[in-house]
């Protein structure tokens, strides 16, 4: 009985045992306002159709998404995240992936920027946007390279290792879509992208989505 969500599976089946273990751990620590997967008649969490589509059934909550135009709800969501993070420092029996380090992300983005510049240079004919892009690219790229240098000179690597030693985990997709305001308080949904990482990454991602 209650509210449930039938959802198409986009995550790897290999992650399901770790995801189940995470949900169990959170629930045991008193985090009852979370979604979790419901097993089918065969005791499996994923049900496949003849055409190959895969679905899972999840416990859901009646409510609405966090309203990012209301300061009070943003603060409540941030407090909810902090509470989650205190219990999301735990070594799971099933191994989980580590997040891509920020430096690697920055360098990858910079390589992609160069590829975009190369593509725009070869574009024929060029319009107003293409000329403006090429004119401003060098300044933008200098800022991108400066960000990499700043990160390399910071204590990021030490902070990352400390978080790994504490078995820190992040939600991985903590945005207003996954924060449901209910009569009983905030319900946190969709932990499918959880991974090992510096936990403040969740807060950064949440605030970035708020400011967008």
Range-by-range predicted roles:
Residues 101-104, 192, 210-211:
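A ubiquitous short alpha-helical element
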Residues 85-89, 148, 152, 211:
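Hydrophobic/aromatic-lined pockets within catalytic cores
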Residues 7-13, 94-169:
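ATP-dependent phospho-/nucleotidyl transfer catalytic cores
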Residues 199-212:
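Active-site activation/catalytic loop segments of kinase-like enzymes and analogous catalytic loops
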Residues 50, 108, 195-198:
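A generic short alpha-helical patch detector that favors 3-5-residue windows
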Residues 23, 85, 89, 125, ...:
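Gram-positive cell-envelope targeting signals
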Residues 37, 149-200:
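Active-site acidic catalytic loop and adjacent metal/ATP-binding pocket
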Residues 3-95:
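ATP-binding pocket architecture of kinase catalytic cores
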């Amino acid at each position: 009985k209650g509210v449930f969500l039938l959802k198409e599976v986009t995550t790897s089946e290999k992650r399901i045992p770790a995801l189940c273990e995470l949900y169990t751990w959170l629930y045991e620590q008193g985090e009852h306002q979370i979604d979790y997967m419901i097993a089918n008649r065969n005791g499996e969490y994923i049900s496949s159709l003849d055409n190959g589509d895969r679905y899972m059934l999840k416990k859901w909550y009646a409510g609405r998404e966090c309203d990012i135009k209301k300061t009070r709800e943003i603060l409540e969501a941030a407090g909810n995240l902090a509470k989650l993070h205190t219990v999301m420092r735990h070594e799971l029996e099933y191994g989980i992936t580590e997040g891509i380090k920020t430096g690697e992300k920055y360098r990858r983005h910079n390589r992609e920027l160069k590829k975009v510049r190369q593509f725009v240079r070869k574009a024929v004919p060029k319009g107003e946007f293409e000329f403006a892009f090429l004119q401003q690219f060098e300044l933008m790229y200098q800022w991108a390279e400066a960000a990499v240098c700043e990160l390399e000179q910071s204590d990021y690597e030490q902070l990352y290792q400390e978080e790994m030693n504490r078995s820190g985990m992040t939600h991985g997709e903590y945005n207003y879509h996954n924060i449901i305001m209910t009569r009983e308080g905030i319900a946190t949904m969709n932990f499918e992208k959880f991974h090992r990482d510096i936990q403040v990454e969740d807060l950064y991602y949440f605030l970035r989505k708020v400011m967008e």
